[in-house]
Amino acid sequence: MIHFNLLETQLTPLASFQEIMKKTSIYHLPSFHYLMDSEAQEDTREAYDDKQVVTEIMARCFIPTLITTTSWESFHFIGHEIRITEAMDCYGAVVWPSALVLCYFLETNAKQYNMVDKNVIEIGAGTGLVSIVASLLGAHVTATDLPELLGNLQYNISRNTKMKSKHLPQVKELSWGVALDTNFPRSSNNFDYILAADVVYAHPFLEELLITFDHLCKETTIILWAMKFRLEKENKFVDRFKELFDLEEISSFPSLNIKLYKAVKKNRRSV
């Protein structure tokens, strides 16, 4: 399992994450830690590590110092301030903690998962934060989502990557399971990475999402997927996902109910 590197930060967390921060503040190991058996010690250490890293992740979100007529939230990754415009009345136009987890992972594991000059697609890009971070890390990025979200997605990506990214990110419509052969023909799908954050929840398009993952993947494509577990439906989707992909849990954040997965397509000839 991959361990994140802790980084120092002076950023103030947003009010929307204050409750999470209270629950995940860094604390010292209890004085009786060394009186526990080895298994209990390991459980305590993992809880301690989880809270340390989650505190650092959430601290990447901070309160704007200027009050403007436009509502936006600010984040700090790859040495850049990233300003994101959200729409609180739409699930797809809000930055969720899973996106912060995935961004932090990409930044702190940039050597192992090198994005430079890689072809990357994000499905369910929402506000575009993950796509922006991947672009700032040097990737050829295609950010996708539903047509009604593309305007805000394009705005956020353009304002945060112009003159900063090695490659100009693309924004495209992608409704899961719809016109995949037309809009994303398999012959031109040469994605090194598929990124996804919080795309699995109580919506009626889980089968279409699975079809989309399968369609976009080649044998060499790596999926990096951050997922928040809320209901039994999420567990059932993971079971279905495992029928098509080899799935590896690379990190877990119990205090957030979020897991980070790496997946590759199963070798159909060996199934």
From Swiss-Prot:
The keyword S-adenosyl-L-methionine applies. The keyword Methyltransferase applies. InterPro entries: Methyltransf_16 (IPR019410), SAM-dependent_MTases_sf (IPR029063). This is Putative methyltransferase-like protein 21E pseudogene. Protein-lysine methyltransferase. It comes from Homo sapiens (Human). One of its GO terms (biological process) is methylation. GO terms for molecular function: protein methyltransferase activity. It comes from the Eukaryota. GO terms for cellular component: protein-containing complex. It is an enzyme of class 2 (transferase). CDD domains: AdoMet_MTases. Disulfide bonds: none annotated. Coiled coil: none annotated. S-adenosyl-L-methionine binds at W96, G124, A125, G126, D145, W176, A197. Keywords: Methyltransferase, S-adenosyl-L-methionine, Transferase. Its EC number is 2.1.1.-. Belongs to the methyltransferase superfamily. METTL21 family.
